[in-house]
């Protein structure tokens, strides 16, 4: 079983480092999508630097969106960027697993027992706001990261 961990990236180096170190023993490839534009359509610099993560270099598939289609709303730009993930799955076979989440949604993959019983699975995760030490105690859990076999993936969004 191979897992392709897929997410959007902006400038979250610390959380990305935590994600790589937490999930690398479970993940075959990390598919990272970054855009030259923010979700409002403003140009921005690319922030991902492979040299900051040399230890994981062979596991990283880094995709850059050069340009969004015209006349997209903010949400449509985000959806376009998330759907761009499929371009990084060309080496995945139909029975490999595709994990889709935000970079700061780090699932506990050691809890995976038997995914074959389900087409789709969502991970119940703790909610933190802005920083690792700001946990939501009122509503502490939500369903964040999702995983399925590539053959069942209709859209990463």
Task: Put a short name on every predicted segment.
Residues 105-157:
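Conserved catalytic core of nucleotide-sugar-dependent glycosyltransferases
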